[in-house]
Swiss-Prot record:
Name by which UniProt lists this protein: Nitrogenase iron protein
Residues with PTM ADP-ribosylarginine: 102
Post-translational modification: The reversible ADP-ribosylation of Arg-102 inactivates the nitrogenase reductase and regulates nitrogenase activity.
SUPFAM superfamilies: P-loop containing nucleoside triphosphate hydrolases
General function of this protein: The key enzymatic reactions in nitrogen fixation are catalyzed by the nitrogenase complex, which has 2 components: the iron protein and the molybdenum-iron protein.
Residues that coordinate or bind [4Fe-4S] cluster: 99, 133
Keyword line: 4Fe-4S, ADP-ribosylation, ATP-binding, Iron, Iron-sulfur, Metal-binding, Nitrogen fixation, Nucleotide-binding, Oxidoreductase
Amino acid sequence: MAGLRQIAFYGKGGIGKSTTSQNTLAALVEMGQKILIVGCDPKADSTRLILNAKAQDTVLSLAAEAGSVEDLELEDVLKIGYRGIKCVESGGPEPGVGCAGRGVITSINFLEENGAYEDVDYVSYDVLGDVVCGGFAMPIRENKAQEIYIVMSGEMMALYAANNIAKGILKYAHSGGVRLGGLICNERQTDRELDLAEALAKRLNSQLIHFVPRDNIVQHAELRRQTVIEYAPASAQAAEYRKLAQKVHENGGKGTIPTPITMEELEQMLLDFGIMKTEEQQLAELAAKEAAKAAAAVH
């Protein structure tokens, strides 16, 4: 266990968190690291590209079939994927029933008790980040994940979620050893995206670990249920993920305690960058449009 790096990828739904994490981990395994992935997202897609398969059976669904978690063996839930990466999905309940975070808690305890954490260099948690409720905060709260990487973009909701996740990290940073490893910007090609990502990282007392450019090759690889590292190892995008993996690898012990900002400060930042408009600007634009329309109608 000495030297075990427990990292987690958080980010809002649909941000490309699972894609980014799996490509990063595929690049890390190429560097000779032994890896265990624990998927903590109810979608159970945190290991799909590593296993080249549809979503794997989750600990919760297998436990329900077997009777209880105690009735499971480690080999029932742990699958081996690309270059020996160990994969587990914790799963979640039926929509509208129970707490999705409960599966995370149940899974991590089961894995630890059954020796899944032995003989690995990295344990990576892939966690839904829109809701920092008790269950999803579990890897942070229980002092499991030590380094949190927030996957975000220049879109307002992604920035909002990143700031919220930073609040969750701050809450547990003093009682446990959890730190913010940094932000990973998954390019959405919004205005001034790199500047905004770097500015937010600075405000959060952190760093932008890497800016991942947008490339359709990611979708081509996903359709084949593969990471870009496996599908197109010589591509420019694979090189980007390798750079990201190298930066994560060299970032051990360099995490910080975040300084989240208020909603007002976040909105002010978006205004300063011209991403968001004031009500006056919006009204002026609307008035200009109406005037142009009226002028066109006259002619």
